[in-house]
Amino acid sequence: VAYKIVGRKYPDDKLKVINGMVDVKKVLEESHKYNATLTAFLSAVLIKSIIDEMPVRSKGKKPITILIPVNLRNFFPSVSARNFFCLTYIQYDIKKHGEDFETMVDVINTQLKSKLKAEKLLGTIDTYSAVEHNVITRIVPLVVKDFFLRIAYRMSGRAVTATFSNIGIVKMPENMNKFIKCF
């Protein structure tokens, strides 16, 4: 079970999204000062901000767990237009590692390096594929699968503090660039 961010809910269960823009070169420079990838560095920034806003009585009781979608096209060739990704979790335990930012970056970078290897990702893909191609899951009616998927989704939500996604470099066809201000 992961630490949960608490606070007031918005009316009608609406989400509040904060968008920001930064010069990626400057952020990359900063991440390289820590010998970290951009994703590891920004994940550590997210974790640090969660810790900074965390009530004192909650610090160290539960780990902070970040869910990160991984673009599998970076690891395996694919011509599919469909989503080709899997999910990985990184975890930071304040009790074990403390609140030093440099330590956070190092711990997160180490976890990502070990989890983002083709062999490990293949294991995850195999697990997903085995469930999808299982005879029992194919014959169970959709309404029953939906029921159990909702339960699984709620249970997995307990294991996550936040989600962070770095979609990476997006290249569009040259003729489209004049219509795009930013991503």
Regions found by a protein language model. Give the residues of each.
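Structural preference for long, well-ordered alpha-helical segments in enzyme cores
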Residues: 27, 38-50, 108
